[in-house]
């Protein structure tokens, strides 16, 4: 089986037939140069699945789910609150924190924060790619940028 892993946001089930979006289809067909009947992995919050390519037409890849490889992971919550920083450093921080198991990112705007706007879609894409590469099943959530005074974090109840 190949090492290609892609995030698929929709529900997956055994013997299901579906199509990848345009970007993922381009990645598989043009970048990875996969052919019909080759196998790759898809994952979402419910688990990881083995999929087989049925066909590639008009740059859209059609696949069939063969079997489930792994069940959903139960992980402890690990949040990372950070002040947005310049792009390259922020991308690196998101990648490494995702690899380490962070489950939620909280961008916080402080009085002296230089970068005031974040492109949430771009950051989500970076987080998804880091999840694909690090063999994670669950993809961390990124919240919108908030002022520190609006953040309410309650301490979890402890069993002891």
Give the ranges of each region predicted by the language model.
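N-terminal positively charged helical leader segments and presequences
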Residues: 1-71, 121
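Residue-level signal for inorganic ion chemistry
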Residues: 37, 97, 127
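Conserved functional loop/turn residues at catalytic and ligand-binding sites
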Residues: 33, 101, 157
């Amino acid at each position: 089986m190949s090492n290609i892993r892609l995030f698929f946001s929709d529900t997956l089930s055994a013997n299901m037939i579906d199509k990848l979006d345009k970007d993922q289809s381009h990645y598989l067909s043009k970048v990875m140069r996969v052919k019909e009947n080759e196998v790759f992995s898809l994952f979402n919050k419910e688990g990881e699945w083995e999929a087989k390519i049925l066909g590639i037409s008009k740059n859209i890849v059609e696949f069939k789910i063969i079997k489930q490889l792994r069940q959903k992971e139960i992980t402890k919550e690990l949040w990372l609150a950070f002040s947005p920083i310049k792009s390259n450093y922020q991308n690196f921080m998101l990648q490494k924190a995702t690899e380490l198991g962070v489950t939620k990112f909280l961008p916080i705007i402080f009085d002296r924060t230089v970068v005031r706007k974040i492109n949430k879609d771009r950051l989500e894409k970076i987080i998804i790619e880091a999840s694909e590469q690090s063999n994670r099943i669950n993809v961390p959530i990124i919240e919108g940028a908030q002022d520190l005074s609006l953040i309410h974090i309650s301490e979890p109840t402890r069993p002891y």
